Design a protein with these regions (language model features):
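C-terminal alpha-helical cap/extension of soluble enzyme domains
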Residues: 6, 11-15, 39, 219-309
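A generic short alpha-helical patch detector that favors 3-5-residue windows
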Residues: 2, 6, 211-215, 256
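A structural signal for short hydrophobic/aromatic patches embedded in well-ordered alpha helices
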Residues: 64, 124, 157, 235-238, ...
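Active-site beta->alpha loop and helix N-cap motifs at the rims of alpha/beta catalytic domains
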Residues: 2-148
């Protein structure tokens, strides 16, 4: 089993490669996944938001999970599989399959169709980890799941599961606040976006479920080294650069209505690291080849170092 110490730094959450008919493009996905593994990332995961778990059937999820574990195993890269579902049994079935494949960890958000009652929280996580003994658990905490856990709820999950080692903290959750990050970091690793590493790193943030390490692994792995070394002054210009990318570079695409998967295809393709098709599945909007050219031009004019792979 992975330990808490293994769940640090930027774990690469690659987009899914779809072909022109929106079927899984296994060849393109393998190519990009192998390239990510060869960079020395601390781990890889799939079936989060960028991995479009919400836009595929169970048999497709199984195929993508199988390929991900196979490629990562071949390269000696730790691998985590997202198992989020709208119901407990769905998460359990995915957890059991991840264990069967030989994954190292699972990542799960709360079931999100109806907000969970506080009394259901511990039982849900106990059921999930009971289906994948020996695997580490990370929580994907997002307000898209309609509920944010309290510090006490995080601690209770830690105690009842015995394998909860990291939380992916997003906006409006406790891990994205300085005090909440400090308190959570006492017993689990807190992952936040790389642009927050210089501000929340001193509060204990130690890693990321990364959509940028496969845009420029050289830059993001260097930033991760600075994070582990607690070199806050050296880290700050890099996080400022990523803040500018988010606020300025991606602004035209935010105005178009793009969301996670479109952004993350777009950034990885704009730098030239990814080779897959920019398309993602509906309902949500896809990036286009023209968008890729537009973002690359902005990067060249404003953050040229991010194009240096």
């Amino acid at each position: 089993m992975l330990t808490r110490n293994d769940l640090k730094g930027p774990w690469a959450g690659l987009p899914v490669a779809w072909d022109e008919n929106l079927g899984f493009d296994e060849k393109a996905y393998r190519t990009d996944l192998e390239r990510a593994c060869k960079t020395g990332v601390p781990g890889v995961y799939t079936a989060g938001t960028t991995g479009e778990f919400y836009a595929m059937e169970l048999d497709e999820w199984k195929q993508i999970a199988r390929v991900t574990v196979e490629v990562c195993r071949n390269h000696g890269t730790p691998v985590m599989i997202g198992i989020t579902s709208t119901y407990t049994l769905g998460a359990q079935r995915r957890a059991a399959y991840a264990a069967e494949l030989g994954a190292d960890a699972v990542q799960v958000a709360l079931p999100f169709w109806m907000e969970m009652d506080d009394r259901e929280i511990n039982g849900f996580f106990e059921d999930v980890v009971g289906s994948c003994p020996g695997l580490a658990l990370t929580i994907y905490e997002t307000m898209r799941a309609r509920k944010a856990l309290t510090l006490e709820q995080h601690r209770a999950v830690f105690e009842v599961t015995g394998c909860y080692y990291a939380v992916k903290s997003n906006s409006n959750t406790i891990g994205c606040t300085p005090e909440g990050c400090r308190q959570l970091s006492e017993f689990v690793n807190v992952w936040v976006g790389e642009e927050l590493w210089s501000s929340l790193g001193p509060c204990g943030a130690i890693g990321c479920a990364s959509a940028l390490v496969y845009a420029n692994p050289r830059v993001i792995l260097h930033m991760s080294d600075l994070l582990q070394q607690q070199s806050w002054e050296e880290l700050k210009p890099w996080t400022d650069m990523l803040g500018r990318l988010n606020e300025e570079g991606l602004k035209p695409f935010t105005e178009k209505g793009y969301t996670d998967s479109a952004y993350d295809h777009l950034q990885g393709l704009a730098t030239g690291f990814l080779s897959m098709n920019p398309r993602s599945r509906g309902t949500y909007l896809s990036a286009t080849d023209a968008d890729v050219r537009q973002l690359r031009a902005w990067m060249a004019a404003n953050i040229p170092e991010f194009l240096e792979l």
